[in-house]
Amino acid sequence: MILSFVFGLLLMTTQQVNTQDHLEITKDGHTVTNINRLDFSFPYTDLPIIDSNKYNQFLDKLDKQFSVEPKNASFDQHGQIIAEQAGYRIHRQSFTEQYYAYYFSQQQSKLEIPMLSVYPKVDSELLGAIRSIRIGRYVTTFNSHNKKRSTNIQLAAEAINNYVVFPGEGFSFNKVVGKRTTAKGYLRAPVIVKGEFSEDIGGGICQVSSTLYNAVDNAGLKIVQRFSHSRKVPYIPPGRDATVSWYGPDFEFKNMYNQPVLIQAKTLGNLLIIKVYSSDSIEYIPRKIPSF
């Protein structure tokens, strides 16, 4: 805001906003849109002063349209590493410099959207290194004939599978799995609400959060937040469950170790298996976890 105001003051004696010319915005040589100086100028003035709020909203819209999220390296179902993929976002500084040159030049022009590479946090080398040793594990069983509940368990397990928690980082089950919706494939299945059985979208995912809790507890990771159900659940020993709800309780832990940890989760028949891995240089203290 201050920068655009200063530019305006410097040029106000020699320049007024030309409303006839335009700037052609292109991507890979194809026209995306055409904009005029008035689109981002303060109204009721002939001075060339940019409205930074409008301009930034325009950049945000372009960024949302053309940005590509990076993809971390991961393991496939056969244990082979799938290489990482770089992402891209608009190079806002370069775009702004070119836009300012147009805005204060009184010339019709064209601007090719500059892109900036965004690299994933987890590459193939790191992923391979942190699967050296297993530091935690837990297995629970479920009724695979209950298709709706089984579907929810599988979807939640896939959401946390291959997730890497770096040293000092926290893990939130709700943030990683996201909101459970029908658009994501979640189905209505039994849940426990205030001690009573009911049905809701995503019923069954608490088995995933509970199995994860025991796996990371077995690995000696720091438990930050955990709540038990209001009644006993059949798939875990008493007091070893971790209930979650999008608008309610969450399960959280933190990696206090000196190395990243890798979560691997999968369903196999009627088994939900969650393992925690890290590099062979990790200094960890495992905990003994009760099982059925």
Which stretches of residues belong to each language-model region?
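Surface-exposed, secretory/extracytoplasmic low-complexity segments enriched in Ser/Thr/Asn/Gly/Pro
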Residues: I2-L3, F7-F292
